[in-house]
Design a protein with these regions (language model features):
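Beta-sheet-dominated interaction scaffolds and their linkers
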Residues: 1-27
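A surface/secretory-pathway sequence property marking extracellular, secreted
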Residues: 1-3, 41-81
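Polar/charged alpha-helical tracts
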Residues: 15, 52, 56, 62-70, ...
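Intrinsically disordered, low-complexity regions
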Residues: 7, 47, 51, 62-65, ...
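C-terminal, structured domain-capping segment
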Residues: 22-38, 88-141
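Beta-strand-rich interaction surfaces with strong enrichment in secreted/lumenal proteins
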Residues: 13-16, 79-86
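Generic "edge-of-domain/loop-turn" microfeature
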Residues: 3-5, 17-19, 35-37, 47-54, ...
């Protein structure tokens, strides 16, 4: 029967973010051993950036992904190598990457967020600066 859904969760923890940080990269490979192609969907189900819980602020997964593109001096992106994972052993890669160049082009934002990131990490040494939980679903089609 079609329509079966498989779900996996990716937990992303970036200890410290700061201008000039080493780029962060994490990936999850999902394979499809079934006999039916599946559609891959990813959704941010929890997001915490420097102590701000974005889900608690009422942001949707799409809001959060767009916010990562537009609202911060660092870049954080989530992508999938394909929207469809073919039957009989095909593989798809979900990638999470983050970076913060020394010169993002906006010194004021770099300074503001740099200070925030520094203070957060100093005050919360045991907590990740960025923590995400991403649900990846493979839905047979």
């Amino acid at each position: 029967g079609g329509g079966e859904t498989t779900e996996e969760y990716i937990e992303v923890n970036i200890d410290a973010i700061y201008p000039g940080m080493q780029p962060f990269y994490q990936e999850l490979k999902a394979s499809n051993d079934g006999e039916t192609d599946a559609k891959i969907i990813y959704e941010v189900v929890d997001a915490n950036v420097l102590g701000d819980n974005l889900i608690a602020k009422g942001m949707s997964s799409l809001d959060i992904i767009n916010s990562f593109k537009n609202d911060y001096p660092f870049t954080l992106s989530i992508s999938s190598s394909s929207d469809i994972i073919k039957a009989n052993g095909d593989e798809v890669t979900i990638s999470i990457s983050a970076s913060w160049d020394y010169d993002s082009g906006n010194d004021e934002e770099d300074t503001k967020w740099g200070n925030r990131a520094y203070d957060y990490h100093k005050d919360n040494p045991d907590l990740s600066s960025v923590k995400l939980l991403i649900k990846v679903s493979a839905i047979q089609i």
